[in-house]
């Protein structure tokens, strides 16, 4: 079992802590997506898949190639890595494509990843908006 810090260090080595994503860093987004699936009772392999879900890049983010697949498998396991690979290759928006192209547990896992990914971005956007509104309100009071 690979510890959390080793996984985070690998993501940092790929620049995830420097790349911006939805007003935070990509690393913060990946951790947030993983945390949502964890809170929802997702399995450990699904949590790992969420933590790494953009490691190969997506339609919106060209991050890395799939040349690190063996390294990623060694960190999160084959089942989680397969989900990461499929997720990264699935064009956005994903939900309908996942429902059409996959069945069974893979479909359930991909839909859970997609939902957590979208929810994390929504939560981050709401926090940023509330922070901005709070600052505007404070300025108005002063």
Please state what every model-predicted region is.
Residues 1-142:
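Metal-dependent phosphohydrolase cores
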């Amino acid at each position: 079992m690979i510890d959390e810090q080793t996984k985070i260090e690998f993501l940092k080595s790929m620049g995830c802590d420097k790349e911006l994503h939805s007003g935070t860093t990509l690393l913060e987004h990946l951790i947030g997506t993983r945390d949502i699936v964890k809170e929802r009772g997702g399995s450990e392999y699904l949590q790992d898949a969420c933590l790494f879900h953009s490691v190969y890049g997506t339609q919106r983010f060209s991050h890395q190639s799939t040349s690190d697949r063996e390294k990623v498998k060694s960190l999160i396991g084959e089942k989680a890595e397969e989900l990461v690979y499929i997720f990264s290759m699935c064009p956005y928006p994903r939900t309908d494509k996942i429902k059409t192209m996959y069945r069974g547990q893979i479909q359930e896992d991909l839909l859970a990843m997609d939902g957590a990914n979208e929810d994390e971005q929504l939560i981050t956007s709401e926090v940023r908006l509330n922070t901005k509104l709070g600052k505007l309100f404070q300025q108005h009071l002063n």
